[in-house]
């Protein structure tokens, strides 16, 4: 049975006492890179993707971050007392995974009101140390991703032409 080893408040700069509101606003996906002993936290709505390195004592230290967009979501939350998701908020991360060498994040880009139709979603690849490496365009119906250990292929769960779930595979070019 696991035990909590450390609690890190990723968004301590926001004075949100209601834990359910904080969860709604700052939920996301987590991926771990074994080789680098690094975690990537990619939030669903907030703009800052954070990378944490595991220390020798088992604690976690933030080592890098990458900002998607302008940070307008965080600015609005800082200035607001309502702490609600709005129809024009953008969903950033849908899914995240890692391979031996990289982290991958499935970027959505749709607003919560679904007022914009998207032509693509994007798989964003970061090095195991949190540096942006490349971006792949994918079908807008992709919902989940996983990548082969050697980064040669991406596997996806997507919505098929008749509305059914379908599994897809695409080869990735290795640089």
Residue ranges, per PLM feature:
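Structural signature of eukaryotic scaffold interfaces centered on beta-propeller domains
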Residues: 22-37, 42, 88-99, 146-150
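Beta-propeller blade signature
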Residues: 1-2, 118-131, 169-174
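Short loop/turn segments immediately following beta-strands, especially the blade-tip
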Residues: 52-69, 170-175
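Short glycine/acidic-enriched loop and turn motifs that connect beta-strands
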Residues: 45-48, 110-113, 160-164
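Blade-level signature of beta-propeller repeat domains, shared across WD40, Kelch, NHL, RCC1
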Residues: 146-175
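Loop/turn-rich, solvent-exposed surfaces of beta-rich toroidal or solenoidal domains
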Residues: 85-126
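Surface-exposed loop and turn segments in beta-propeller and other repeat-based domains
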Residues: 3-25, 59-88, 140
């Amino acid at each position: 049975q696991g035990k909590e080893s450390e609690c890190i408040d990723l968004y301590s700069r926001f004075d949100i006492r209601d834990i359910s509101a904080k969860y709604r606003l700052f939920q996301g996906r987590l991926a771990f890179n074994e080789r680098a002993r690094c975690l990537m936290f990619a939030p669903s709505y907030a703009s800052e993707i954070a990378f944490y390195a595991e220390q020798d004592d088992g604690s976690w230290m933030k080592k890098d971050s990458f900002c998607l967009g302008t940070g307008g979501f965080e600015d609005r939350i800082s200035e607001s007392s309502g702490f609600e998701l709005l129809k024009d908020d953008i969903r950033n991360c849908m899914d995240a995974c890692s391979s031996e060498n990289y982290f991958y994040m499935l970027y959505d880009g749709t607003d919560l009101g679904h007022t914009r139709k998207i032509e693509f979603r994007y798989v964003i690849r970061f090095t195991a140390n949190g540096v942006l490496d490349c971006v792949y365009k994918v079908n807008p119906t992709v919902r989940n991703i996983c990548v082969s250990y050697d980064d040669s292929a991406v596997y996806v769960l997507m919505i098929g032409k008749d509305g059914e779930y379908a599994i897809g595979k695409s080869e990735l070019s290795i640089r």
